[in-house]
């Protein structure tokens, strides 16, 4: 085993961050690099208003990444696609999903800026 990938399809309200961080620590103690993979945020419980929902999704990305980037051993962060157009959640909800950093036309959304800011902050530490 060269590394451990943790699929992170985040569902707000369903993530026990303390337990997740304990898992990350257990993996780190074994000397394995940790890859955050398939990162997206299920927006199903968020507001119908797109601007409000985008901010809510961005907040989840920001909170999660700020916590994760403080952990030693995190080497890769990878989203589950870049654009909502290709999201796993497309067709699983009645409304258009807004779960990834870019919209259907590849325009950056608040989630993109939240990810970029979290990475920039970590890069300055």
Segments (PLM) and residue ranges:
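Residue-level recognition of the N-termini of beta-strands and the immediately preceding loop/turn
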Residues: 1-2, 75
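Short, conserved beta-strand edge motifs with alternating hydrophobic and charged residues
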Residues: 2-7, 35-38
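Surface-exposed cleft-lining segments at the edges of enzyme active sites
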Residues: 6-14
